[in-house]
C-alpha cells in the first residue's frame, strides 16, 4: 500500500500527536493569558481525532495491515478507538474545574492525558510485537507522571512510585516473553506468528515453553486490567491518585489492554486456546471471588471501586472463554464498554463534587449526599445499580450475557457461582446508596457542580440506561466487528 494512503489510516494518531505539541507549547507560552486555552486545544484535537476515526470505521469496510504489518485497520480496532476518544472527551470535561481548584498545571495535565490517549490508540491498533511495546510505554510513562501530578499529595507520589515499579516489572515480563516468542518463530507480526505456530512442529517441551512465554506476555495486560493476582497496585493507585487522574487510570488503559489481549490470544495464539482458556477461567473466578469479598470490608470509596474493578474484570475474562468465539468476543467487548462508562460516571461524580475543599475519599464523605445534590445522587444511584447488575441498566445485560454463555456451554456450576457472587457484590453497592440516601450528613458543605459536568453526567447515565433497554444496537455493531477477527 502506498505511503500516502497508509498515512490516512493513522490520521487520528497524527492529530493527537499534533495536539500534544500544541497543548505543550500552549502551556508554556499561553498559560494564564487565555482562559481554559489548554483544555480547549485538548478537546478540539481529541474531537478531530474522534471524527477521523468515525469516518475511517464507516468508509473502510475491510480489514488489513499497513506499515509493513505494524498497524492493523479493522472494525474492532476502530470501535475501541472510538471508545477511547469518547472517554477522553468526558474525562477532560469532568476534570476541568478539579484541575483548576487543585492548582494543577493544566498544560502538564492535558499534555500527559493526550499522550496517554495517543498511547492507547497506538496499542489498540498494534499488530507487531514492536508496536505493542511502543504503544504500551507511550501509554504507561505519562500515566506515572499523572498519578504524581498533584504535588501537595504524598499519597499520590507513593502511588506513582508503586505503579512505576510494578509497571516496570510488567514491561520486563512482556519484553522477555516477546523475545522468546521471536526467537522461536522468527516473526514479529502477530498473524505471521500464528501461521508459524499453526504449521510448525511445536510439540512436547517446546509447546510448554511457548505457553510460558505467552503467559509472560499476557501477564502485562492482566496487570493493566487489574485482574487477580496482578491487582496489587490498583486500590492504592485509585486511593492515592487525584480523583481526576483516578478516572483516567480506571478507564483509558483498560480499553487498550483488552484490545491487546484479544489480538494476542485470538489472532496470534489461537493454536494454544485449549491451554489459555483454562488459565483465564481460573483467573476470572479468583478475580470475581477475591474482588467481591475484599470490597465488602472497604470504607474508602476509591479502594472499594478498586476491588470492584478486580471483580468486574473477572467477568470480562470469563466472557473471553465462552463458545463460539464470536459470542465470546461480543460478550466481553460489551461488558468492557459498559464497565468503562459506569466507572467513568462514578469517578466523574467524585471528581465533579471534589471542588472547593470538598474531597470525597471515605464513605462518610457521601453521608446525606442526596440532600446536597439530589440530581448527582440520582445519577450515582443509576450507575451503582448498573455496576450491581440491576435491570434495566447496561450492567444487567452485560452480566446476563456472560451467565447465558456459561449455561450454553454447560458450565452450570460456574454460572451459579457468578450469580451468587453478583448478589454478594450488590451489597457493597447498596451500602454506598444507603449512605447517600439514609444517613445524615456530617457537615453543611454545599456542592455546586458546573453545568457542563451535570449535562455530561446526565448523558453518561442515559447511555447506561440506553444500553440496558436497547442493547442490540451496540451488540449488533460488536457482532459485526468481532466476526472478522
From Swiss-Prot:
Its main location: membrane. GO terms for molecular function: NADH dehydrogenase (ubiquinone) activity; NADH:ubiquinone reductase (non-electrogenic) activity; quinone binding. It catalyses: a quinone + NADH + 5 H(+)(in) = a quinol + NAD(+) + 4 H(+)(out). One of its GO terms (biological process) is ATP synthesis coupled electron transport. The keyword Iron-sulfur does not apply. It holds the Pfam family Proton_antipo_M. It is a multi-pass membrane protein. InterPro entries: NADH-Q_OxRdtase_suN/2, ND/Mrp_TM. Its EC number is 7.1.1.-. Keywords: Cell inner membrane, Cell membrane, Membrane, NAD, Quinone, Translocase, Transmembrane, Transmembrane helix, Transport, Ubiquinone. It is found in: Cell inner membrane. The chain crosses the membrane at residues 10-30, 40-60, 71-91, 107-127, 129-149, 164-184, 209-229, 248-268, 276-296, 304-324, 336-356, 377-397, 410-430, 454-474. It comes from the Bacteria. It is an enzyme of class 7 (translocase). GO terms for cellular component: plasma membrane. Belongs to the complex I subunit 2 family. NDH-1 is composed of 14 different subunits. Subunits NuoA, H, J, K, L, M, N constitute the membrane sector of the complex. NDH-1 shuttles electrons from NADH, via FMN and iron-sulfur (Fe-S) centers, to quinones in the respiratory chain. The immediate electron acceptor for the enzyme in this species is believed to be ubiquinone. Couples the redox reaction to proton translocation (for every two electrons transferred, four hydrogen ions are translocated across the cytoplasmic membrane), and thus conserves the redox energy in a proton gradient. This is NADH-quinone oxidoreductase subunit N. It comes from Francisella tularensis subsp. holarctica (strain FTNF002-00 / FTA). The lineage of its organism: Bacteria, Pseudomonadati, Pseudomonadota, Gammaproteobacteria, Thiotrichales. The gene is nuoN.
